[in-house]
């Protein structure tokens, strides 16, 4: 594929971003867990204080998907802070449609994310990858990523909303 553009997402891209989030969730066998709406994406990413940033990969008209979509990939990220090393870019979701893989789109998205991280003086980029997702693990490792689970023994935890509400109400 000769031409594609990686650009910051706009509010008008929210329906495509949600479509790709659902495709990623399906790829990860978790599609029933997507509760987000287009309205949520719009309010959370394009309001006065955005909770996330997003890059999209757009192809020209001659390379549209069979359904007529021009947005074929995305990366959703935000900034966080580590008290030991400072600013971090956290890559929350990263997906390129299967028919558009192998054309350098994913590599270009990662390059743009790296440029954003360097411009913002981030010390590193963090992200999660499912243990079974060898293609993605290899993609990241070829670009210098290290597996903190095996190298440093970190475990990821979460506290669901139900328990957050319970703790918030405690006296």
From Swiss-Prot:
N-acetyltransferase domain boundaries: 4-170
Pathway in which this enzyme or protein is active: Amine and polyamine degradation; putrescine degradation; N-acetylputrescine from putrescine: step 1/1
Pfam family, one: Acetyltransf_1
UniProt cross-references to CDD domains, sorted A to Z: NAT_SF
Keywords, alphabetical: Acyltransferase, Cytoplasm, Transferase
Main localization, broad class: cytoplasm
Binding site for acetyl-CoA: 94-96, 102-107, 133-136, 140-143
Positions annotated to bind substrate: 27-28, 92, 126-128, 152
Cellular location(s): Cytoplasm, Cytosol
Enzyme Commission (EC) number: 2.3.1.57
Active site: 140
GO biological process: angiogenesis; polyamine biosynthetic process; putrescine catabolic process; spermidine acetylation
Domain of life: Eukaryota
Top-tier EC class: transferase
UniProt GO molecular function: diamine N-acetyltransferase activity; identical protein binding; N-acetyltransferase activity; spermidine binding
Cystine pairs: none
This protein's GO CC annotations: cytosol
Family indicated by similarity: Belongs to the acetyltransferase family.
Record's subunit section: Homodimer.
Functional description taken from the UniProt entry: Enzyme which catalyzes the acetylation of polyamines. Substrate specificity: norspermidine = spermidine >> spermine > N(1)-acetylspermine. This highly regulated enzyme allows a fine attenuation of the intracellular concentration of polyamines. Also involved in the regulation of polyamine transport out of cells. Also acts on 1,3-diaminopropane and 1,5-diaminopentane.
Name of the protein described by the UniProt record: Diamine acetyltransferase 1
Protein species of origin: Bos taurus (Bovine)
């Amino acid at each position: 594929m000769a031409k594609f553009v990686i650009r910051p997402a706009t509010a008008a891209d929210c329906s495509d971003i949600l479509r790709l989030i659902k495709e990623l969730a399906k790829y990860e066998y978790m599609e029933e867990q997507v509760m987000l709406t287009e309205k949520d994406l719009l309010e959370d990413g394009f309001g006065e204080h955005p909770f996330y940033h997003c890059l999209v990969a757009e192809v020209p008209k001659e390379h549209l998907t069979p359904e007529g979509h021009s947005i074929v990939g995305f990366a959703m990220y935000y900034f966080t802070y580590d008290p030991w090393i400072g600013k971090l870019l956290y890559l929350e979701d990263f997906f390129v449609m299967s028919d558009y893989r192998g054309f350098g789109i994913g590599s270009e998205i990662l390059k743009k994310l790296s440029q954003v991280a360097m411009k913002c003086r981030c010390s590193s980029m963090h992200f999660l990858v499912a243990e079974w997702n060898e293609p993605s693990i290899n993609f990241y490792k070829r670009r210098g990523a290290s597996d903190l689970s095996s190298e440093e023994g970190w475990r990821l935890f979460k506290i669901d909303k139900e328990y957050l509400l319970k703790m918030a109400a405690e006296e």
